[in-house]
């Protein structure tokens, strides 16, 4: 493997730093839920801010068996959205059953590929945002492989599946103190638990001054962001209800669903509310920071991004298991509400904007106290510091 190096120049352009190998960081992710990938991308950006570090993102499942990975991802999304009780049973079994580790034996080819990648790239540290990797890495160690420390970045809050911590790791990074307490009560030493926050995109830490929602006055339109993740018929029912209010300005994000985009545009024609319909966009940080409220399911990335944008979240859907903890985090910190029907959404919006938006102001202030928008940098700094301590 060819190692990259960097040099610092003097004002006259001559070299002031001897060539030295780049410190390599491997970030392991998977596409089963956007939270894992979102966290991994943020970590990669944070590590790569250091000119002496090169962080590489790897989805082993997509790399080893792309067709199977695409099929299983689609199946996962379909199950959690159309058969939540089945997913709840699966999630509970994964959390409690002592037989779960035996199922990972079917990933032998994934484990061997991971071992080859580590041997080739010789990382100084490994970070993973998906729980299965810790099991594969531990299996490699039992088989005699020797490599750098591995750190687990837990992308769920409060209702944390034991898959995240039932196998060893050099450290665990969690979203909040209560989630840290969950690990400690399950036997993880407190010195290995780091309350860093969820690694959101660096745009949240680098917040531009103009990325603010409009000041709320009697004449200000309330800006509402509706991020549609699943369930077209339910989404259209919510959209119809939102569009009936003249003093609201609605932004819809419909992803890559072109048919849904067109249906939303048709609904918006002549509606009392102002409306903008977006497809897939990478401007989510800006959208969250410039809207007063976001409506969405309680996904890991969406929940944490709303927190770090100081944008109160109305939860329209909860997937049993991991998303229950995400909503509970919002509820405990009084930063949003559960609103699973169009009428509940409309009623809650009217309530939080009443009386000079007193409830909205309270929720936003709570988010500002609770948010950790620089979490990705915190994790990168901690991992690099520990790597230096062991003499890498």
Regions found by a protein language model. Give the residues of each.
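Active-site and donor-binding regions of nucleotide-sugar-utilizing enzymes
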Residues: 34, 89-187, 192
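Conserved N-terminal ligand/cofactor-binding loop architecture of enzyme catalytic domains
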Residues: 42-117
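A nucleotide-sugar donor-handling region in carbohydrate enzymes
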Residues: 170-229, 255-257
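Donor-nucleotide binding loops and adjacent catalytic segments primarily
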Residues: 211-292
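A donor-sugar binding/catalytic signature common to diverse glycosyltransferases
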Residues: 286-325
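Conserved donor-nucleotide binding/catalytic region of nucleotide-linked donor-dependent transferases
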Residues: 342, 348-368, 386-389
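C-terminal alpha-helical cap of glycosyltransferases
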Residues: 372-392
């Amino acid at each position: 493997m060819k190692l990259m190096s960097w040099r610092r120049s003097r004002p006259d352009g001559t070299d002031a730093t001897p060539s030295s190998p780049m410190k390599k960081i491997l970030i392991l992710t998977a596409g089963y839920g956007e939270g894992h990938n979102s966290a991994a991308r943020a970590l990669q950006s944070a590590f790569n801010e250091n000119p002496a570090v090169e962080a590489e993102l790897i989805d082993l499942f997509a790399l080893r068996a792309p067709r199977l990975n695409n099929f299983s991802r689609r199946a996962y999304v379909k199950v959690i959205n159309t058969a939540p009780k089945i997913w709840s049973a699966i999630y509970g079994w994964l959390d409690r059953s002592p037989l779960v580790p035996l199922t990972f034996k079917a990933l032998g080819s994934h484990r061997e590929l991971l071992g080859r990648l580590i041997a080739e790239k010789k990382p100084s540290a490994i970070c993973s945002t998906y729980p299965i990797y810790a099991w594969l890495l531990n299996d490699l160690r039992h088989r005699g492989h020797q490599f750098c420390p591995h750190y687990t970045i837990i992308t769920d809050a409060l209702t944390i599946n034991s898959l995240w911590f039932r196998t060893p790791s050099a450290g665990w990074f969690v979203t909040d103190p209560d989630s840290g307490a969950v690990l400690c009560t399950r036997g993880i030493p407190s010195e290995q638990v780091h309350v860093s926050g969820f690694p959101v995109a660096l745009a949240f830490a680098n917040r531009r001054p103009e990325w603010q929602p409009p000041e709320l006055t009697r004449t200000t339109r309330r800006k509402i962001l509706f991020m549609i993740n699943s369930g077209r018929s339910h989404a259209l029912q919510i959209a119809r209800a939102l569009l009936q209010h003249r003093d609201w300005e609605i932004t819809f994000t419909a992803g890559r669903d072109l048919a849904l985009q067109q249906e939303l545009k048709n609904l918006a024609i002549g509606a009392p509310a102002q409306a903008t319909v977006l497809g897939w966009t990478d401007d989510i940080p800006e959208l969250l920071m410039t809207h007063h409220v976001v409506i969405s399911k309680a996904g890991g990335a969406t929940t944490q991004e709303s927190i770090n944008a100081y944008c109160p979240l109305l939860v329209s859907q909860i997937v049993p298991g991991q998303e229950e903890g995400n909503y509970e985090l919002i509820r405990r910190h009084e930063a949003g509400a559960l609103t699973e029907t169009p009428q509940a959404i409309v009623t809650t919006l009217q309530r939080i904007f009443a009386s000079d938006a007193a409830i909205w102001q309270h929720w936003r202030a709570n988010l500002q106290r609770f948010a950790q928008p620089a979490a990705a940098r915190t994790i990168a700094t901690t991992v690099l510091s520990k790597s230096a301590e062991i003499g890498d």
